[in-house]
Amino acid sequence: MTTKAQSYLTHFRNIGIAAHIDAGKTTTTERILYYTGRTHNIGEVHDGAATMDWMEQERERGITITAAATTAKWKRSGTNEEYTINIIDTPGHVDFTIEVERSMRVLDGAVAVFDSSQGVEPQSETVWRQADRYGVPRIAFANKMDKTGASFELVVNDIRERLGAIPAPIQYPMGQENEFKGIIDLVRQRAYTYTNDLGTEIQEHDVPAEYADKVAEMRAQLIEAAAEVDEDLMMMYLEGEEPSVEQLVAALRKGTIDKKIFPVLCGSSLKNKGVQLLLDAVVDYLPSPLDIPAIKGTTENGEVIEYPADPEGKLAALAFKIMADPYVGRLTFVRIYSGTLQAGSYVYNASKDKRERVGRLLKMHANSREEVTELKAGELGAVIGLKDAGTGNTLIGDGDTRVLLESIDVPEPVIKLAIEPKTKADQEKMGIGLQKLAEEDPTFKVETDQESGQTTISGMGELHLEILVDRLKREYKVDANVGAPQVAYRETITKPVDVEGKFVRQSGGRGQFGHVKIKAEPLEPGAGFVFENAVVGGTVPKEYIGPAQKGIEEAMQSGPMLGFPVVDMKVTLYDGSYHEVDSSEMAFKIAGSMALKEAVQKGAPALLEPIMRVEVTVPEEYMGDIIGDLNSRRGQIQGMEARGNAQIVKAFVPLSEMFGYATDMRSMTQGRASYSMFFDHYSQVPNNLAQQLMKK
């Protein structure tokens, strides 16, 4: 790699701002855009004008739905070095976890924003775990330090206790709640106060005397934490030497990139305090594309290839989001891991096995855009002109060996609704609109019942589907009626069986013949479907194995109990027979389907239901009512935890029992409780209930 390319990549940061729904994430992103000069006036979420929240509904609801990728420039304070920071705004609402998943997949580092008065909330925990899964280094920002009940210590302790991570506070607040007036940098031992409301005039001075002891104590702890992850610093520490600022920053950077420690900062985005220091910390501690491990791809014969970040290397890019844009049509957001993507060139979509032409390339600002001729390794941008690329698809150079990059985990939908247009004339328009929305969002599924012709949509929660029905109305001008929410059950088998499927049709001339023998066995919950080909001696020829598997998979889409998909089982195709003339792919597909249907019938089928992890934050005096009510909903109480003067009740409750819970909870507690709910796992429905459901 040339020195120029290296220097260019060193000055790059791809980060996400990840947080709980009201921790102030969009406001923090807004401030970053304001101070980096990308927006000339500050957009406030609570007056509906935020730049990042650019879908109409997001502005109305004050929540962020779609992760928009924005490019900003920042000069590190006290230096002349300019950095490019790509920010991916991620939604904090649990119904949109796929958006968080996709963004985690393409980020190099993240800023986790916490509400200082609330500490680590349930959704923050979910987002943190996703970042753990994708190995994303993080710095934490204790926001809302000016709010009543704000406590920097609460955030630091919660990171340690609730997240099991090692926090490394690199700042300390001067005052809390309405006394919050500035920030002390523990690394450089300087204090910063703000002299105007916009936060653009910052005064730097010595640490005030009343904070001297606290700062000395916390700085000693910080050096100790850094020494744990850096051997050179450990030697100095043991010999009682004081490290220089540069040595301390280097050690903290190393520890952060290795995900061993997590620097913690503080501020108030709404009051414009601490955001510039946060940007400096993004530059100081979060990785550039050169600091993260090279992305790995797998060839068709299982060989693993590494793609280091190098603009002159072979092209490897991941499509992480599809959006329909009213002006230019379909936008495919991509992260370039290696090589350079040129406008007007051809690429090979390895996931779909298709050659595609790249039209124009755009770099996005929250809702304006800049056209570019190329996107290089380490960059994020949007492509116009790709017709087939979907979320998680791998794009490589035209003519290169087929390689697949690790894709994105797509959770299964847990809730479904029947939907129909208010007027018959809109039927076709509704079909097109739903199909386009499903292309953008892989957790949204559209199905039409073959017998009744009824269309159902399924997704990750009530809010998720409500927003998609709303988009159908706004963007595709289709008014739709929706039914009551239904639970997306699953079916499975509970005992192993051995069955065969034989399809024989003799009707003058060429007949049809397909015959397979399969073993079906239950797997543990969440294991999905596993197919094994154990045919020996060619009793089922190789070319018929694929069609038989396809028949099996298609038959699994509708189980015998209530017609829900069959999951968590392993099918082994071990024998069968064929006919030289009459056998065909179609015959084996039907035989596979017949065998599977019989296997599920004989395998003591059971119904599975989604179980949600519910956390209710409730004042002490209503706790008994809340627990009694959750028990009556077949809930299993997992524990309680005191938080301030409230209690957090944690429970597992079946989704079918949680519809309309918000209203009941409010009336039980006079509106003083709040709750959050996430899908956790599937579990078997008790027999008596399964019987009732089947009678309906």
From Swiss-Prot:
Entry binding sites for GTP:
19-26, 89-93, 143-146
Q: Which UniProt keywords apply?
A: Cytoplasm, Elongation factor, GTP-binding, Nucleotide-binding, Protein biosynthesis
One Gene Ontology molecular-function label: GTPase activity
Subcellular localization is given as: Cytoplasm
Gene3D superfamilies documented for this protein: 3.30.230.10, 3.30.70.240, Elongation Factor G (Translational Gtpase), domain 3, P-loop containing nucleotide triphosphate hydrolases, Translation factors
Keyword Nucleotide-binding part of the UniProt annotation:
yes
* Pfam family membership, one: EFG_III
Cross-referenced InterPro entries: EFG_II (IPR041095), EFG_III (IPR009022), EFG_III/V (IPR035647), EFG_IV (IPR047872), EFG_V (IPR035649), EFG_V-like (IPR000640), EFTu-like_2 (IPR004161), G_TR_CS (IPR031157)
Gene Ontology cellular component list: cytoplasm
The record's listing under SUPFAM superfamilies reads: EF-G C-terminal domain-like, P-loop containing nucleoside triphosphate hydrolases, Ribosomal protein S5 domain 2-like, Translation proteins
NCBIfam families the record matches: EF-G, PRK12740.1-3, PRK12740.1-5, small_GTP
Q: Which family does it belong to?
A: Belongs to the TRAFAC class translation factor GTPase superfamily. Classic translation factor GTPase family. EF-G/EF-2 subfamily.
HAMAP family this protein is in? EF_G_EF_2_B (MF_00054_B)
Q: What is this protein called?
A: Elongation factor G
* The organism of origin for this protein: Deinococcus geothermalis (strain DSM 11300 / CIP 105573 / AG-3a)
